């Protein structure tokens, strides 16, 4: 026979299962429609992006062909033409081959082999055999005008050609873009026609990059599939009788099909298949949170209900049988109440347990008193006392004894304890009458001012009022205070603010008082936020580089550029580089940040220099902290990044930033020496503000020095003498000076008088990404 509790429990289980099944069914019906609609929207969005990317790819090929054409201007010698084409092909891995029809109708073919070696085939006579460099005949009676890339194209326009069989790669299709030389170009070029062939492997890899792992993407020309992404290469793709493609795999994935012509290139079609229709795979995981939440709520309600019933039936049964459980229920006041109908024996047991409970409370209060107050000083040890009393206070302060650990290490625990007792005695003498004093630990005390707030403020602001009591020079007192009313229940939050303020001066070597206002707290909090978030900011791309040109101060010709790091936070807006660079050095993050800046600067410089008209001696200046130069293998990593980007050492300048650090080690000078041997220039940034003393100046022997903007901006004031001294020093050592922060013509003229030849500043151009620079090599004026 089932008990009443068991019967109710069974009914609850049935009700819970019915509710859960109903909810699950309704959820999946609604969710399936939402998932399908969302999959279509995502497919449209993804396809739009892929259309643009594929269009950009073909546009890049066309631009590359034009770039190739530009490289052949004024070249008449066939050897020069060959070298120019090979050089360009080495920089364009997406091209498989390049063909030239010269103005004498002879044909040259530059073909990329499997090992990336570029092989040249040519004709000795018009329409004659096509031979390799050794004279071996590759194709007899080769007539360029009959090749598909020539036949299919209009002589007046540049155009893409349908896929055709490559003569030098049996079984492989070629796709060519043909460039016709017309008009004035015909007089400047020794070429009548150029065709470039796509690198199939590169195109396939590009489709892999722009598509997700679960998307099928391929390109079609006519009835030929000319390129596939990784998933398309793995799937079985069947062209059906309806003119569509079926994607066959082992799991019967449902795909949303999207097709269109390549933008501005109707010759090729894009086929895109986005996975959709699978509820478990396609649905956003966050969509299932409400479902999981309702199930959990139902389960919790069931467990709580059964627990309540179980407890009620248990108590009823136990009260009927025995009151033996009461000694184990000393904290359950409800169980000890005398109720009508209680037997005399039950009342006696409840009274006995109540007496035991009262005795326990008395012992607990005595114990709480012992653990809440320091028995020797009388100071409060437990903040719960302050919070529970919730008294009104007029101000709050904190006292920190620094250097106590050193005393203990040298003189022992007894001497340490002696100093702590003396400190507590002095604190009690000065503040006990007007403050509640809380001991956090032996060297940290919180003062909560009850009255006489002016006296309290005056006393706590006194510096060195404790120093003579200890007799140890390295012991120092750091104090801070907030002068505003507060309740005891909020005392802990004020204590945390004061601890934060004290932490900002923990390394100061003298006793100090810091008034803790909102501005100070905001500054400390911002520095902590920067330290915690700078790594994440670098990872998500909030840190980026801008470049300010360095110009000839007389002609204003651009001589180089300085890479400058900027941080625009989505949460806090623009973060000053003076702050986050300094903090990165303080927390040991400067090496990781510095290498990221070097990689980014060299990569962006490489891309910009390929498409811009820069002087041959253009110099990219990259700021490097002395902390980085203290690293053993800095020059090796710098060189590796330089070679990866194909840059020449004489196009780079390392600017050593003016950071004051405790020790310059032997690696600092070794790195400078190795970089200089390779041809990298060395400059001292912000000369005169930090690192640069005369000894280091001569040890580094820089190729140039930069005068900080704080000096140039005040050149007509007190800083003018410093600027003149710097220029005299540089002139004596025959070292060029670059003036930073030039913002007016008056300053520029004064610098010219001093012999300055290079400058940078907003007078010429503000810092901006290379993408915003004038590619002709001129300054950008807003």
Swiss-Prot record:
Q: Which GO terms describe its molecular function?
A: cyclic-guanylate-specific phosphodiesterase activity
Localization per Swiss-Prot or TrEMBL: Cell membrane
Enzyme Commission (EC) number: 3.1.4.52
Q: What broad class describes the main subcellular location of this protein? A: membrane
**Which residue stretches, if any, does this entry annotate as coiled coil?**
none
The transmembrane residues are 12-32, 286-306
Q: Which residues form the EAL domain?
A: 527-781
Q: Which SMART domains match?
A: EAL (SM00052)
Functionally, this protein is described as follows: Phosphodiesterase (PDE) that catalyzes the hydrolysis of cyclic-di-GMP (c-di-GMP) to 5'-pGpG. Overexpression reduces biofilm formation. Cyclic-di-GMP is a second messenger which controls cell surface-associated traits in bacteria.
Spell out the protein name for this chain: Probable cyclic di-GMP phosphodiesterase PdeI
> What organism does the UniProt record list as the source?
Escherichia coli (strain K12)
